[in-house]
């Protein structure tokens, strides 16, 4: 219906997000020129996605739809490489096409593929180097490079962690050896962690706060 309305009024839907049942209308999406941004394997967690399947991304891609893998979760958003790999497991997608769903394809959806999404001369020098195949759960980030500058180096990070641990041990030892009683401490009050997701406003009202 959305695509019919768009065509009636002379515009095109660029991307359908959270389209967990997109496989049902993938041919129509291709005809319309719409792309898809979907979760990898979420299904049946609410009525609207009762018929979602983990083959969704692959089936849409097979119809020629440009597909990206997304997440609105703070934790899962850090592991989209592993989320993309699920389409290899479930749908038999090639590794190259799976990687595109979290690199080049999202850039295409945002119309930024002229400067990001792939390693090519003239594009932004934003690169992540892994210890293994980035689609493997064993892979660890070795380097993160933004605009050609190394912002994360795993070996240096280990050295920093060791230095911080030694400093922590030194401070604790000094505290234990001190004869001073010090002032009365303030009771520790744990602040709830704020966690935002796509349904936060609907669940928590206008404040947009959701605590766990």
Task: Mark where each language-model region is.
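C-terminal cap of metal-dependent C-N hydrolases
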Residues: 120-164
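Active-site environment of divalent metal-dependent phosphoester hydrolases
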Residues: 1, 19-26, 76-77
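C-terminal recognition in membrane/secretory proteostasis and scaffolding
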Residues: 134, 172-212
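Pro/Ala/Gly-rich low-complexity, hydrophilic intrinsically disordered segments
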Residues: 153-185
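His/Asp/Glu-enriched, well-ordered alpha-helical/loop segment
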Residues: 27-30, 34-130, 139
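Short helix-capping segments at alpha-helix termini
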Residues: 9-10, 92
